[in-house]
């Protein structure tokens, strides 16, 4: 009797359109929100990125996407030093110009990421997470959630499996089927998470989970962080 294909296994087949779809969904929600905010809101601190303001995060995101669109990946790109230079290059820009560049990047980077064979998929997930950071800084509801969450969770699951991350089975309020993350070779029993999708995203990206209700068994939160 052959092995049965589970829904979790199906996720391992890369959907090249998924990263671009995630960016487009987030663009359609985030850009109008940014354009409606007062200028001083762009100076608010972002708790998930110490030392960065909302504007810093947006400048980092727009610069990264512009690099993708223009295929500019010099040595050291996306290092902390490179990120700081990208932000500094935009110091003289208006907030509106940064938002315009971000909108263009979120629109045009998708096809480039789709054609990159998977090596840029994590960047799309990172952009979506940073959008959650901005929503969080604004006190907006739905940070690390919303319409893009299913695509973000599927991307997160595949990326953690490709990286051989610690195995975890997540029973999510937001999905009908359990989500399997991390390596599945059986070397260690999987941990288990019970809770909602935004909290799982926070755990995997090192964001604070203060006040969130969830269960995490068999693995420590610090072991989940894909950016750690």
Regions inferred by a protein language model and the residue ranges of each:
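Structured surface interface patches that mediate subunit assembly and partner/cofactor docking
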Residues: 2-19, 44, 73-80, 114-228
């Amino acid at each position: 009797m052959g092995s049965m294909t589970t829904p979790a296994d199906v996720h391992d087949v890369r959907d090249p359109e998924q990263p671009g779809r995630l960016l487009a969904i987030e663009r359609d929600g985030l850009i109008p929100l940014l354009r409606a905010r007062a200028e001083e809101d762009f100076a608010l601190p972002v708790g998930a990125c110490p030392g960065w303001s909302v504007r810093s995060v947006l400048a980092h995101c727009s610069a990264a996407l512009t690099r993708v669109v223009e295929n500019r990946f010099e040595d050291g790109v996306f290092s902390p030093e490179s990120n700081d230079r990208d932000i500094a290059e935009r110091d003289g820009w208006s907030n509106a110009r940064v938002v315009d560049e971000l909108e263009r990047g979120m629109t045009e980077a998708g096809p480039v990421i789709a054609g990159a064979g998977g090596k840029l998929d994590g960047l799309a997930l990172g952009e979506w997470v940073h959008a959650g950071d901005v929503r969080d800084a604004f006190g907006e509801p739905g940070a690390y959630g919303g319409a893009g969450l299913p695509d973000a969770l599927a991307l997160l699951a595949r990326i953690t499996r490709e990286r051989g991350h610690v195995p975890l089975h997540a029973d999510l309020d937001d999905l009908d089927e359990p989500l399997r993350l991390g390596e599945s070779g059986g070397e260690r029993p999987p941990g288990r998470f019970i809770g909602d999708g935004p909290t799982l995203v926070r755990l995997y990206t090192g964001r604070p989970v203060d006040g969130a209700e969830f269960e995490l068994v068999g693995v420590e939160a610090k072991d989940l962080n894909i950016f750690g």
